[in-house]
């Protein structure tokens, strides 16, 4: 049997278990894969957009989709309610047109805030898909001028081996190797020997941030703006953290840690992180477009300036034009 066209709104996920902390396994990718295997003339399906940059178990599917030159068009809705008014789907939704005879760039249309922007795109330009057409020129400038990105030093989840629910003792132990454990709740105390990962960071000055984004999987506030990063903090020597946080950097001097913390507060950095987000959790890969800086006193950035002034220095350093500056300033909240 031959199909000329396959059209569908496949089931998005299968929930595993009955407890509130259980999760869903994506299903829509399997329907898309089967449809492509059938090889009709056309396929069009609407799915969550989370596959652009993340999603549990979607890495292989994402690479397959980004490398598929038969995808003629994608129509993306950052806010799923623009497509389904009564349904909130984290990361938005999108539908695509697959054409067996098409073998060139994809016409990608992004819908956001009542506006639509269309651009011919090479889907596999990066190992994730940047849904914001307006951000591409800035990303190209930054990558052309940068040897190392910040993701190279961001810790993976559970940086010291303690899950989010783990708690140590309420009071410090008499053992001199006792260190403080920061969690999303109150601080507690653990022995150094209980730290199973990254012991080399324990005695350094660290910058940590919450693994959860401030927004609901990339959904803006009512003004169309984002904060992106929620909790940011300095973690002193002899302090570690649970899985609730990731470590952005660990330094021998407090000055470098302070300057990294300031850098993460800039609109420039948070705008670049935003381009990788379609889910609520942050990971090292979300910092793939953020250039690593010199955080010492020898830096070409004056870190003693205000965050607003540092943003201006970064705009100058990376040749950010007025249109790009306006987009950043209007998209990202002050922090």
What are the residue ranges of the model-derived segments?
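Short amphipathic alpha-helical surface patches that mediate protein-protein
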Residues: 48, 265, 330-333
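C-terminal substrate-recognition regions of SAM-dependent nucleic acid methyltransferases
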Residues: 80-242, 246-301, 305-312, 319-322
């Amino acid at each position: 049997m031959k199909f000329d066209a396959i059209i569908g709104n496949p089931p998005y996920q299968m929930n595993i278990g009955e407890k509130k902390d259980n999760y869903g396994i994506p299903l829509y990718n399997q329907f898309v894969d089967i449809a492509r295997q059938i090889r009709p003339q056309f396929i069009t399906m609407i799915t969550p957009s989370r596959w652009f940059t993340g999603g549990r178990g979607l890495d292989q599917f994402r690479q397959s989709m980004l490398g598929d030159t038969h995808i003629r068009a994608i129509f993306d809705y950052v806010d799923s309610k623009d497509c389904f008014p009564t349904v909130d789907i984290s990361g938005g939704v999108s539908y695509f047109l697959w054409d067996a005879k098409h073998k060139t760039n994809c016409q990608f249309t992004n819908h956001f805030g009542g506006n639509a922007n269309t651009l011919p795109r090479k889907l596999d330009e990066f190992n994730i898909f940047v849904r914001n057409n307006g951000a591409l020129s800035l990303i190209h400038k930054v990558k052309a001028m940068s040897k190392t990105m910040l993701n190279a030093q961001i810790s993976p989840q559970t940086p010291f081996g303690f899950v989010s629910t783990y708690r140590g003792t309420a009071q410090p132990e008499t053992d001199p190797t006792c260190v403080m454990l920061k969690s999303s709740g109150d601080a507690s105390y653990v022995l150094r020997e209980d730290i199973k990962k990254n012991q080399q960071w324990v005695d350094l000055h660290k910058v940590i941030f919450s693994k959860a984004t401030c927004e609901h999987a990339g959904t803006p506030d009512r003004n169309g703006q984002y904060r992106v990063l929620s909790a940011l903090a300095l973690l002193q020597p002899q302090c570690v953290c649970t899985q609730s946080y990731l470590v952005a950097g660990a330094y021998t001097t407090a000055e470098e840690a302070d300057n990294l913390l300031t850098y993460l507060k800039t609109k420039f950095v948070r705008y670049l992180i935003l381009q990788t987000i379609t889910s609520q959790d942050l990971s090292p890969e979300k910092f793939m477009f953020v250039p690593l800086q010199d955080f010492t006193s020898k830096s070409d950035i004056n870190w003693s300036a205000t965050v607003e002034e540092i943003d201006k220095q970064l705009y100058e350093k990376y040749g950010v034009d007025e249109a790009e500056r306006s987009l950043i300033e209007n998209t990202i909240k002050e922090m």
